[in-house]
Structures are given as C-alpha cells and as structure tokens.
Regions:
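A shared catalytic/ligand-binding motif for oxyanion handling
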Residues: 1-162
Length: 162
C-alpha cells in the first residue's frame, strides 16, 4: 500500500483502512509505505507530528495488530541529503489470526540503489528444533569416488587424513 503524504488525506486513509479491516475475516496483513510513524524511535530527529503519530497509534491499537520485526536496518526511507532525515515509513502489521498461522513472520530489508526507500521482503523466521536426521540420497552412490559407511565414525578405522 502507499499512504498519502498530506495530513488531511492521512486521516481519510486511516478511516479507509478501518473500514477494510472491518470486512476482513481470517488472517490478514497490512504492508507498505504508510507515510506515518507511531513512535519517535521511528525517526532520527525530533521533528515529529505528534498529533498524527497519536492517530496512527490509536488506529494500530484499535485494530489489535502486531508489527512485524524489521531485520537488517532501523529505517526504511532517507531524504538522501548530507545530514539525512531517516524514517521507518515502510512497515507491516498483522492481525492475531495471521500471527497464529505464521508466527515467525518478519521483514528483511534489502539494498536499493534506485529508490529513497529500501525494499522489504516478507518472510518467515524458521526455528529448527530437535536433532536432525541423516538423510541418504540414492544418487550419491553414482558419484565417482563415493564410499558409504553405515556405521559411526569409530567404525571407519583410520584418521581424518585418510
């Protein structure tokens, strides 16, 4: 999504999002350039529109959403000046149903040489738990020089140099 830049339009944008969310059943995710921040930590200077921040924060609270963590950087937009303003305008928020189905949802930042925004990739942070099983691939036997030892390392008889 792309949020408007003008304050009057931002108020209408948030109301439109409320209306859309009200129609949603099941898991959903809002992602894109909101052109809004809800906390001072999302900007690298103190030039803040606190009234608009409050409106966005109330919208997020009322919508009962969770913000997806951003990996790789803190800010997603720069005005690209010598002393840049940096802001996290690009974000993703999910409902609780989404979080139940995709509990490891994340945003990964990517490099961009084309835009003043960095691209974000939606992904899952997967945890591998437990002991991993050995999996034999039958094509290995066709690889020249392949030798399979079914037992443990102690049964190989020899050193690592052999």
């Amino acid at each position: 999504m792309y949020g408007p830049q003008e304050d009057e339009e931002k108020v209408l944008f948030l109301q439109e999002l409320r209306n859309i969310i009200g129609l949603c059943n099941g898991p959903w995710l809002l992602a894109g350039d909101f052109n809004l921040i809800y906390q001072a930590a999302n900007k690298n200077n103190a030039n803040l529109d606190r009234a608009m921040m409050g409106r966005f924060r109330r919208f997020l609270d009322d919508s009962e959403v969770k913000e997806l963590p951003l990996l790789g950087r803190k800010y997603t937009w720069s005005n690209e000046r010598m002393s840049p303003t940096l802001v996290r305008l690009d974000q993703a928020f999910c409902c609780l149903d989404w979080e139940d189905i995709f509990p490891g949802s994340i945003l990964q930042s990517a490099a961009s040489g084309v835009s003043d925004h960095c691209p974000l990739i939606l992904g899952l942070k997967i945890k591998i738990t437990g002991k991993r099983r050995f999996h034999f691939e039958s094509f290995w036997t066709k690889v020249p020089g392949f030798r399979f030892f079914g037992g443990g390392a102690a049964e190989l008889g020899g050193s690592c140099a052999n």
